């Protein structure tokens, strides 16, 4: 049976899983977080969208999960020579893509989703990729040092400031791209990938139309936690800041606050955290160290999806 899968993704954990789905030629689309989008030296930067695009094009830097593999940094280095403090280290090919997207949006009048689709086609990607919204929604980390854009908090401050809370500015007025809505409505299953719940998936669910559709769909969820620690990134600190334990139990409780309940929860086989009752749980090795691991986990996800609705 040819089942349609829509994946909710941020920029690190879930792209590793997308790599496996890509290798298996699965039928899926992706809705991507844009809460970290920013403008840097005149460029429109959409880090999570770009990582997903690079992953599906087979050119992602899979050591950092940001940017393009084997990219150079002569542009960044020359900016340093000019005395320009570029807050994000952008590679040369990566910069070219960002420049092209900025041109499409500013000069050609394309919406973000239209620009992303144009780039997707030019990169030869057959899977549809949608930003969660064409409107500006910004993830703000509320800290003891003031309100910080997520880039400021994580890249510039190293995630060190004590966190009081997280909010998604502009989410109440934002709407998803119509094509993303259509894709989500056609999906047989929604897969919530192992991205940071608070700053990757939370912004997507903060868009009310997306949230309401996801609530009505079968949901498979992959935990980004092993024990009480995330596999990578600041998810633990941010989960605690918004009132949840950084564990698979806290993950379920966090998504329940959004009204989203997993039909199947995939968690790591080494994880012994006690879970809420009534959950259908599959335990497997969720750690994706390389492409082989990504394919293995993706194959398991597809098996679960087929059992759920096939």
Curated annotation (Swiss-Prot):
- EC? 2.7.8.28
Q: Which GO terms describe its molecular function?
A: LPPG:FO 2-phospho-L-lactate transferase activity; magnesium ion binding
The residue range of the signal peptide is none
Print the keywords alphabetically: Magnesium, Transferase
Which of this chain's residues are annotated to bind 7,8-didemethyl-8-hydroxy-5-deazariboflavin?
A: 50, 89
Entry's Gene Ontology BP terms = F420-0 metabolic process
Q: Which reactions fall under this protein's catalytic activity?
A: (2S)-lactyl-2-diphospho-5'-guanosine + 7,8-didemethyl-8-hydroxy-5-deazariboflavin = oxidized coenzyme F420-0 + GMP + H(+)
Reading the lineage from the top rank, the first entry is: Archaea
Q: Which cofactor does it need?
A: Mg(2+)
Q: Which InterPro entries match?
A: CofD (IPR002882), CofD-like_dom_sf (IPR038136), FbiA/CofD (IPR010115)
Question: Which NCBIfam families does the UniProt entry name for this protein?
Answer: F420_cofD
Q: Which family does it belong to?
A: Belongs to the CofD family.
- Self-association state and partner proteins as the record states: Homodimer.
> Which HAMAP family has this protein been placed in?
CofD
In Swiss-Prot or TrEMBL terms, this protein is called 2-phospho-L-lactate transferase
Native source organism of the sequence: Methanopyrus kandleri (strain AV19 / DSM 6324 / JCM 9639 / NBRC 100938)
Primary gene name: cofD
């Amino acid at each position: 049976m040819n089942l349609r899968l829509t994946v909710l993704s941020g920029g690190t954990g879930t792209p590793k899983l997308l790599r496996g789905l890509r290798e298996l030629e699965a039928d899926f689309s992706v809705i991507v977080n844009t809460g970290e989008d920013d403008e840097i030296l005149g460029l429109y930067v959409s880090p999570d969208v770009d990582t997903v695009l690079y992953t599906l094009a087979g050119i992602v830097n899979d050591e950092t999960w940001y940017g393009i593999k084997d990219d150079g940094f002569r542009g960044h280095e020359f900016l340093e020579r000019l005395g320009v403090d570029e807050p994000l280290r952008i590679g040369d090919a990566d910069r070219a893509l960002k420049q092209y997207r900025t041109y499409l949006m500013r000069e050609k009048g394309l919406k973000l989703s239209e620009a992303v689709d144009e780039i997707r086609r030019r990169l030869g990607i057959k899977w549809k990729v949608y930003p969660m919204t064409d409107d500006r929604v910004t993830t703000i980390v509320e800290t003891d040092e003031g309100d910080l854009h997520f880039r400021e908090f994580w890249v510039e401050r190293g995630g060190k400031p004590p966190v009081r809370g997280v909010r998604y500015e502009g989410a109440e007025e934002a709407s998803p791209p119509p094509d993303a809505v259509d894709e989500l409505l056609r999906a047989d299953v929604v897969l919530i990938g192992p991205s940071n719940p608070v700053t990757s998936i939370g912004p997507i669910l903060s868009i009310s139309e997306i949230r309401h559709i996801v609530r009505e769909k079968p949901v498979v969820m992959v935990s980004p936690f092993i024990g009480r620690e995330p596999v990578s990134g600041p998810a633990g600190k941010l989960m605690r800041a918004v009132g949840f334990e950084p564990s698979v139990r806290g993950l379920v409780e966090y998504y329940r606050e959004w009204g989203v309940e997993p039909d199947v929860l995939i968690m790591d086989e080494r994880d012994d955290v006690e879970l809420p009752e009534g959950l259908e749980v599959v335990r497997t090795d969720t750690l994706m160290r390389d492409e082989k691991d990504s394919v293995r986990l993706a194959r398991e996800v597809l098996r679960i999806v087929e059992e759920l609705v096939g």
